[in-house]
């Protein structure tokens, strides 16, 4: 593959600069290697190949899901997919940096979190990466409809050059009659799963004085406010992705993360809008206070907060009248002077590195979590797998514990001997720090003085077990109140509560919380999601009786109905011979018990057709993996008869599977 390595990174730029035609005679003839050697495909029901995609322009996106730069280009990929819907196939080649990122189920959850709609290949052993000579994340490689490499580029901000080349390639191969413009049909991961009250919650904030818990319900694009006992207070945001200011029920966000509280003011890191928002808890309004809505690629900017662009603000900490911002995009810590309404760079050169020293010379790597005791700003430096300490008054940065960009693992100990894996959350606990060691699925304790780290909770493997031997699934946010630790257990779509006295863990239940209306409406289609029609033989009912429609569904071994999701059913009848009360005809039921029994009245003799539909959300009993959603539909011909021996009940049966 020497020829691939030597040419493909520069061809694309040369072609654009010189305006060279993309014909086979004028561009280097390097056949695109096939996509093999990994653990399989997602977002498609069958394997894809370069050969089978002949006639399509193919864009390979080499990425790893913990990389902020890889996340930044997802909107560009979506724009390209929309613009060239019938000519272009984008394929994500997920070549993992971290061990945790090699797991196909973890990649599936990231696909769901970022609403990725193109096929993704799990290149867990770097087979495709090596065959294409890739050197960095993210890298995009463009392949022409004849199956030859056009070129490749690395990093962010390459939309325009890729767009222009695709336009030329499409025009040329269309003229030659060698362009396949039939849309590629895909089976997306999102079609296989349901929606829960919380979706990938990121950060969390607790306030004992006001009995409030604030949850960044990131993938529902809203903030959920509850009491500490789980009573729902309100939601901030409609659930739609957007950046609208205004009343709580009109405002919109886009995957919010970090939160900070001052009195009746809640500050919100609106991550994918690249904004800082302010929610007034008294007037119940949202206002944008920093950012332009565009992503910056600058490292040292300062000025009026609304005129300076930001880049993926991930966490917030308030010290006095200064709001510190973990700016994951440029690998820096920024600050906002709330009195002057000005933002500026606080720490970090912009170089992705583990480098201690003076504020502006230090190097960070995707800082994503912060905590403070008022004097020191502690930082979870995720991609370097370390915990940093910034002395605010002295203006210095030092590393407390951990490895480096490619030195990670799960090892307790002291100082540089400690190994973490992409930690995202921090909080002070007395004179200690608690760490959400995200990719190790653990909560750990750090003594900043001795630099000793000890694992406290979690098995090191993903799960959702409560009790004194708990398990988590990529926990990302931490909050403390009344000697209880609240954990945003992101991949479990849940908030977990650790009683720091008893050391027992429970799952936090929010009474009355449902997914945003737009999410529920999407599920209420005419036939329901993932519908299966079940044929039923004609049945008889005895006239003049009050019986029931009994629906029993067999779940796959090791699965249970999700108690947090509303199970839904609808009953429709086309005759007056059989009736069902309006209140029983269509319902959403939490904690549904099977078999389901719906009262049914056989009024008088005659034929009737009953249509019964149930939509069930079911998950593994250990709550690992994604939950599934399936709709079963029965069409039942019924004869209501005066026969005294006829039954009074209609019984329907169905079966769910653990496979798609």
Please give the residue ranges for each predicted region.
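N-terminal "domain-start" segment that seeds a small globular fold
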Residues: 23-50, 527-534
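Thiol/disulfide oxidoreductase modules built on the thioredoxin-like
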Residues: 112-116, 122-165
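Thiol-/selenol-based redox modules, centered on thioredoxin-like
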Residues: 144-203, 513-522
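Extracellular/lumen-exposed scaffold segments
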Residues: 230, 502-660
């Amino acid at each position: 593959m020497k020829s691939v390595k030597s040419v493909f990174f520069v061809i694309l730029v040369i072609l654009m600069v010189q305006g060279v035609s993309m014909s086979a005679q004028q561009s280097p003839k390097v056949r695109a290697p096939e996509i093999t050697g990994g653990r399989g495909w997602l977002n498609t029901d069958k394997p894809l190949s370069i050969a089978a995609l002949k006639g399509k322009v193919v864009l390979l996106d080499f990425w790893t899901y913990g990389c902020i730069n890889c996340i930044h280009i997802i909107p560009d990929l979506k724009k390209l997919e929309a613009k060239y819907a019938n000519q272009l196939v984008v394929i994500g080649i997920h070549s993992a940096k971290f061990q945790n990122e090699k797991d196909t189920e973890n990649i599936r959850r990231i696909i769901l979190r970022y609403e990725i709609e193109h096929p993704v290949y799990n290149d867990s052993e770097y087979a495709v990466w090596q065959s294409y000579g890739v050197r960095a994340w993210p890298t995009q490689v463009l392949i022409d409809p004849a199956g030859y490499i056009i070129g490749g580029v690395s990093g962010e901000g390459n939309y325009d050059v890729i767009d222009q080349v695709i336009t030329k390639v499409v025009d040329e191969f269309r003229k030659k009659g060698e362009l396949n413009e039939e849309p590629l049909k895909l089976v997306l991961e999102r079609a296989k799963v349901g929606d829960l009250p919380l979706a990938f919650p990121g950060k969390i904030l607790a306030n004992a004085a006001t009995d409030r818990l604030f949850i960044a319900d990131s993938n529902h694009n809203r903030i959920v406010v509850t009491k500490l006992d789980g009573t729902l207070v309100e939601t901030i945001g409609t659930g739609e992705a957007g950046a609208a200011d205004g009343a709580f029920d009109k405002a919109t966000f886009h995957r919010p993360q970090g939160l900070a509280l001052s009195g009746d003011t809640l500050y919100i890191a609106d991550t994918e809008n690249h904004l800082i928002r302010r929610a007034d808890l008294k007037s119940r309004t949202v206002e944008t206070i920093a950012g332009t809505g565009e992503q910056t690629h600058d490292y040292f900017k300062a000025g009026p907060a609304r005129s300076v662009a930001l880049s993926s603000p991930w966490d917030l900490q308030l010290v006095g009248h200064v709001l510190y911002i973990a700016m994951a995009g440029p690998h820096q810590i920024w600050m906002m002077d709330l009195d002057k309404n000005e933002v500026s760079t606080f720490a970090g050169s912009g170089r992705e590195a583990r480098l201690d020293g003076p504020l502006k010379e230090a190097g960070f790597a995707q800082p994503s979590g912060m905590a403070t005791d008022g004097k020191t700003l502690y930082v979870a430096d995720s991609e370097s797998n370390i915990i940093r300490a910034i002395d605010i008054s002295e203006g210095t940065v030092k590393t407390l514990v951990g490895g480096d960009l490619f030195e990670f693992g799960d090892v307790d100990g002291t100082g540089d001997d400690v190994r973490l894996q992409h930690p995202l959350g921090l909080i002070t606990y007395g004179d200690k720090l608690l760490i959400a060691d995200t990719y190790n699925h653990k909560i750990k304790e750090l003594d900043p003085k001795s630099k000793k780290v000890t694992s406290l909770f979690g098995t090191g493997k993903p799960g959702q077990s409560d009790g004194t031997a708990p398990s988590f699934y990529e926990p990302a946010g931490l909050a403390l109140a009344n000697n209880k630790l609240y954990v945003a257990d992101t991949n479990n779509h849940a908030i977990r509560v650790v009683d720091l006295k008893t050391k027992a863990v429970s799952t936090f239940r929010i009474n009355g919380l449902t997914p945003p209306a737009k999410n529920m409406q999407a599920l209420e289609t005419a036939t329901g999601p993932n519908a299966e029609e079940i044929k039923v033989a004609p049945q008889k009912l005895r006239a003049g009786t009050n019986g029931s429609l009994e629906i029993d569904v067999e779940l796959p071994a090791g699965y249970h109905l999700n108690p947090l999701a509303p199970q839904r059913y609808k009953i429709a009848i086309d005759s007056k011979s059989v009736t069902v009360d309006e209140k029983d005809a269509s319902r959403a039921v939490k904690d549904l018990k099977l078999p389901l029994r719906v009262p049914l009245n056989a009024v008088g003799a005659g034929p009737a057709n009953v249509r019964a539909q149930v939509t069930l959300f079911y998950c593994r009993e250990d709550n690992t993996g994604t939950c599934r959603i399936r709709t079963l539909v029965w069409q039942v011909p019924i004869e209501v008869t005066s026969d005294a021996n006829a039954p009074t009940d209609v019984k329907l049966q169905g079966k769910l599977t653990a496979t798609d």
